[in-house]
Amino acid sequence: MILINIRSMIKKLNLLLLTLLFVSCVDDDPVLEPIEAMIVTNLEAKTTSQPGQPLSGDFVKFSFEKQTVVEGDDWDIAFRATTILVNGGFAAADDEPSRTGIAAGYVAVGAYGSINNVDESLLKQDSETAYAVPTGSGNGWYNYEGPPTHLITPIAGRTLIFKTHNGRYAKMEIQSYYKDAPESPNAFTDEAQVYTFNYTYQPNEGVISFD
Amino acid sequence: MRSKYISKLILLSTIIVISNINVFSQNEDSIKTIEMKEVMVSANKTEKPFVELTVPAKIISKKEIENSGHSRLDEIISEQVGIITVPGFGGSEGVQLQGIDPEYTLILIDGLPVIGRVAGTLDLSRISLASVEKIEIIKGASSSLYGSEALGGVINIITRKVKDEGFKKNVYYQYGSYNTQDILTDISFRKNKFAVFGNINRYSSNGYDLIEGDGQKTVEAFQNITGNLGLYYNMNKLGNLNLNYKLFEEDRDGTVFITSPGIENKSETNENNISLIYQNKLSKSVDLNIDIYKTKYLNKEQQVVPNGIINENNFDQSLSRVDVRLKHSTSSGSYYTIGFGYDNEKLERTNISVKPEHKSQFLYFQYDWKTNNKFNLVSGIRYDSHNKYSSQLSPKVSFKYDFSEDLNLKGSFGYGYKTPDFRQLYLNFSNSTSGYIVLGVSVIDEVITELQNNNELMFYDELFTTNLLAENSNSYNLGLQYYVTPDIPLEINLFRNNIYNLIETNIVGRKTNGQTIYSYSNVNKAFTQGIEIQGSWNPIKILTLDGGYQLLYAKDIEAIESFQSGTVFARDRITKQSFELKSNDYFGLYSRSRHQLNLGVSFIINQIRDNINLRFNYRGKFGLVDTNNNSFLDRYDNFIKGHVLSNISFNKVITKNISFQIFIKNIFNYKDEVNLVNNPGRIYNFKVILNN
């Protein structure tokens, strides 16, 4: 897994933009920490089962704040194949990690850049019957194209909004389900269950804006 | 083994015919071709002069077929205006008419339906052009005469009939690239009231491979045989009798199964049909016609290892039909046709546990009314009653109005439908390697209950209804025909097809092991509309130009609504960012080209004995799959580029019985190895023809 901090890239490339961003933050509230915009590439979330068999294997737990995979209870979301869990609510199966936080989430329709506020009324936690991020083709973040391509493609214009395990907010866009995010993935030759996504993390408690 | 026997038979009969060729060639070879007043049978189920037709139609003549150099139906059909062939599994080719998918065009041989739509599409490359007299194409829904499947239109292949007295023969041999061989022996004999005719055609090829090193060929080697045996007897006042037997057999390496090392893939197709047609003029004004028809199609796909068969897929379909019709003519030139009959269709198929049998009765009526010299109105209606679906009532009205001798207006409205096929009703298919299940609506309740009882079901969204409706369309055509001069006909036709209840596969559930469960439902509405222009021109005696153009818009109604609601986005392939699409970014349905252009040039040289034919077929850009993550085809998707395919044929008469042909297909060697798998590039063919 590789992380790229977009803000530090921007800092090097375009100091002016950063200054504007910073200034706008300062104008709102001088004590706020700056938001973090990140890209995560090749996060592996593999099942150990064969196709057609019950899914098995550990969920890969991720922390927006730590910008990495974590082992403890401070995870915000967890991945296994196409399933995404939030660290809030109840587990639907025994092999899921137990929920210890207050995380929640929903799927927003809209371009990543245009979704700048959290609609708290839409937030849902995982439960025994449904996940905050719905599973199934066309229901949540992906489409399963079926035969003959069998591709899993992240639906364009689906932004995942999360409340983290400790009550901060993040927005996230999944860009690819295949290793190295190929331009034209092939389900038969490209390694699947490997996520590339970008996210924006709002580290300030209670702030619902990503501006 | 049977085909080897038949191959020997062909060889033997060919030798006999060739050795006899000089003895029997007594007929005068007429250089002059007299343009007979062409008639069409498909539009009215009875002969009607082509120029008087009220519906958009096209005839491909025997001469055009022979001069073109083509061997199979798909090749010549794809050169027609507004027709595109679409590749399916294993080198099969379906037809797209007025932008409507291959499942929805009825294919007939001598007026009787061809069956064997294994995956919905009827493979036109199955049909040989050897011994074809002409091909009739009707555009627009025609269920008022033909019932199910005639939603986009009808293609009727008319095979050669015996006309002349005495012993006739026609033999040819064609050799081409990829070791493609096409051989025909056609013999007929007529004496007074009795005629017998038979022909046998063998077509084989080594196939070709566009992408080497992927372990499988693009089109595998195959050989097939098409045979026909017919008897004709004129019993004077008792009428005419036609008895016809046709067969098709094909062996192909490779199947729908994925190729693996050490495993041999084999595909075998057997098709047999027999028809008895009885015609009698009961009185001066009444004609009786009875068709009795039985056809059987068997396809076997096998994966074979040295110690046995490891995987098998069988498809065994049969259809029996009786169609009785009476035509009553009046003195004014008007006539009405009344017909009735029944169909019985059966299927045995791997992954279908039941052996479904469909029975239907039908009744149709058509009135061809010549109100005066200028106005011809044809109206008809057909009623189909089916043991498994709700009955269908299919009307059609069409007219032709002559403003003058040079200018006329044609218009038609027709209803077309297609009953759900056996797959959509009875399939119970489980793919263990990629993990999904497909269930037909008639078996879904049973299977779901079983899964529930075994605690194997995670969720199931119950189908709104397990009663699939027939897919149907309302089709409208309006056209002008204008003779600029008697030699320059120009035709423009506007069309619109509103298609309802399109059947789609949807996810309905999931098993506890993660397998997705698919089923079928009537969801989509779509339309196709466009303009078709065609004409021909004889500027000088030895030169003929003909051309056509089609503008096509084919769209899904739900997709249009999604785009309008602003919920459709696309992902940029480089930046991976999503952006919102606007209404006008929606391109339309897959595999449809907005523009299609055909141009033909024919030179007659050497005192009308020989000819050169050039054809240019342009197909505008089209999309095959969504490439930017929104399940729709939009302007930012990857398209297959617009391209021209050009053919040239040279026909040379050596003596009055011998001629030859050089045919180069795809002269400029246009290829797209990834997307156009049905195009192997440039192909050379050489053909020798012996006849009398």
Regions found by a protein language model. Name each.
Chain A
Residues 10-18:
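Sec-dependent signal peptide recognition
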Residues 26-158, 180-184, 190-211:
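N-terminal "domain-start" segment
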